[in-house]
Amino acid sequence: MGPVVLFDKSFLQSLSVDESVWFDHFFLPVVSPLFFVETLADLTKQQRPGSLRTPEDEVRVIADKTPVLSGAPCVHHSQLCIANLLGHHAPHVGQIPVAGGRPVRGAEGKPGVVFENSPEAEAFARWQRGRFHEVERDLASNWRAMLSELNLPEIAQRIRALGITPQTCKSVEEAYGIAAALVHSRYEPQQQLGLLFAFVQMPAYLRASIVHRWSEAGFPPLAHYASYAAHVLQVELFFQIALAANLISADRPSNRVDIAYLFYLPFCHIFVSGDKLHRRCAPVFLTKQQDFVWAAELKDDLARINRELMATSEVERQQGLHTLAPRPPGDSSTLLVSLWEKHAFGSPSEDGAEPPFSHEAQRKLVEHVNSFAKAP
């Protein structure tokens, strides 16, 4: 099983359809809500002069490349943040939080969870056919509004109350350090929560219970109490500090959406992007067990793999992707192989090949999965 990878829209747009197939095959992609928002935003753009493709055509092309076999749409960060503050554990690296799980028991009484197709997955399937629903445009607009319609005077006042003076910050590393130090401290917990409530637009009816719950625990550092909520606050503080210190341009509105991809870093092994803001800022948030990969470099290696595997015989290709290439071809000097060696789940057999999977084993696996899917 391949590494879990977070990607942005710029990376997927850069791929050919064939390259996107190999990306979906060799990785477990995190389809973030930001990708959904950015893709739908293209519908509002004007058709480029001289181009034969309409905005709807452009979105259909992106939908054709969207990972559907291995990837999964991720729950919105605000919902994850609220759940974490209410006592639910946050997922860890390598776990994609997916909505809609239904607990069932299979034919032999074994417990399992069935996930129906998410609205986002169904939407991308329709977009491939050129069908767009107005409700999706509204949803994307609401998500975008959450990122752009902030009460800036309130946020500035709360940041000052926390003793933060962004103008003294000289680098993105310093901005990260200031934000990290705060969420790991017990300093002004009410102000910290006030900022977090403003950033995620916390529903009013939940605020008192969240404050009470943290108070009952003795106001430990937010990073120890609700690690994912602390991460969201840390990203938001980092961005506001970096803006005020002129480390990030305030003249580019898309920076607000771009930085929001960092909310989903805790779930991935790899973040791949072709965005310069991501290249500068994402590495300070990554652990030693995670990597940032520049989009052009991964695209080049996917193109190499496509050339090599398309040069195989028709008979070999007809056997399917999992038989043709259970692992990325190449040695440790190639990007995909090195990423797999560091991040892929499980270890290869001695000869580097996957163990054989017989037709009988495949049949039993299908029956096992179907027993869950058909369970009430």
Residue ranges and their predicted role:
Residues 274:
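Conserved residues at the C-terminal ends of beta-strands
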